[in-house]
Amino acid sequence: MTFDPHKKLYISDVTLRDGSHAVRHQYSIRNVQDIARALDKAKVDSIEVAHGDGLQGSSFNYGFGAHSDIEWIEAVAEVVTHARIATLLLPGIGTVHHLKEAYDAGARIVRVATHCTEADVSRQHIAYARELGMDTVGFLMMSHMTTPQNLAVEAKKMESYGATCIYVVDSGGALSMQDVRERFRAVKDLLEPSTQTGIHAHHNLSLGVANSIVAVEEGCDRIDASLAGMGAGAGNAPLEVFVAAAERLGWNHGTDLYTLMDAADEIVRPLQDRPVRVDRETLALGYAGVYSSFLRHAEVAASKYGLSTVDILVELGRRRMVGGQEDMIVDVALDLLRQRGDAARQAAV
């Protein structure tokens, strides 16, 4: 394909959805409005708003939110004039009824998210979103867990259901730049030319920005990023960093870099109760290929049972656990505890 450096990139901010993981879904109404105002001023194209695990994610399994999805969406709708409001829906957590409520509250874009090999479960939700007239996106999570060719087949399914944009989603922050290149080439080879593509990167191997740049070079249309990288694990591609890099490359991103830089440092970073960065634990996510939102759950389990968070995360990766299996984190911790006890008894013999 021919790369067009002058194409207008679609900047999709995820601070108010993926970023929710970094504050345990405790954004206040004032928080979301302050962040949304800054993003709107900077002229991002869309602002995703929801619990970190999407519509209806607020639960015992994923963590209760400080407010409902609808309250957050309505709050953002009150203060934005340029950006469109997006939301995330995981079939099995949210339903078409919840999507209609989000639409009524002001959401006009929905990203229907499934595991990278389970696009089949998105048919009803994608079709209904199109009926509502929403900008409908297929969101293939944990894309490192299948081959580029298989990912392309799943992308084609979502396209056939009505999605007009398909995302390669690196939920574990485990993809290398070559991995991204191969997946975009395979996906774009199978999709219709009119179907857009997007990249959702995580920064667990410090490749969030690099992988987003590679995706754009391969013809990607939409780029997810968040202020100060606010997101699960080591965070997403930091929005202000990606925009600075895009500016240096002469790409047309349409946003105001300095407004984004100010918002990242003055509004978002002070909200973090745990630094969003690459450290021992978040690096383990990318190394082991683990769903980034498992981090905080694994840290709680490690503290409760006197274990290493890294050991729990690596074992989750070995077992190929995926999003939605948060309840298994405690099971893994108990198994490790049992193994440690067995080893101690064996050593004492």
Curated annotation (Swiss-Prot):
The keyword Metal-binding applies. Residues 9-261 form the Pyruvate carboxyltransferase domain. Its EC number is 4.1.3.39. The keyword Metal-binding applies. GO terms for biological process: catabolic process; L-leucine biosynthetic process. Pfam families: DmpG_comm, HMGL-like. Substrate binds at R17, D18, S171, H200, Y291. The active site is at H21 (proton acceptor). PROSITE patterns: PYR_CT (PS50991). Keywords: Aromatic hydrocarbons catabolism, Lyase, Manganese, Metal-binding. It catalyses: (S)-4-hydroxy-2-oxopentanoate = acetaldehyde + pyruvate. It comes from the Bacteria. The record marks R17 as: Transition state stabilizer. One of its GO terms (molecular function) is 4-hydroxy-2-oxovalerate aldolase activity. Mn(2+) binds at D18, H200, H202. Belongs to the 4-hydroxy-2-oxovalerate aldolase family. This is 4-hydroxy-2-oxovalerate aldolase 1. It comes from Azotobacter vinelandii (strain DJ / ATCC BAA-1303).
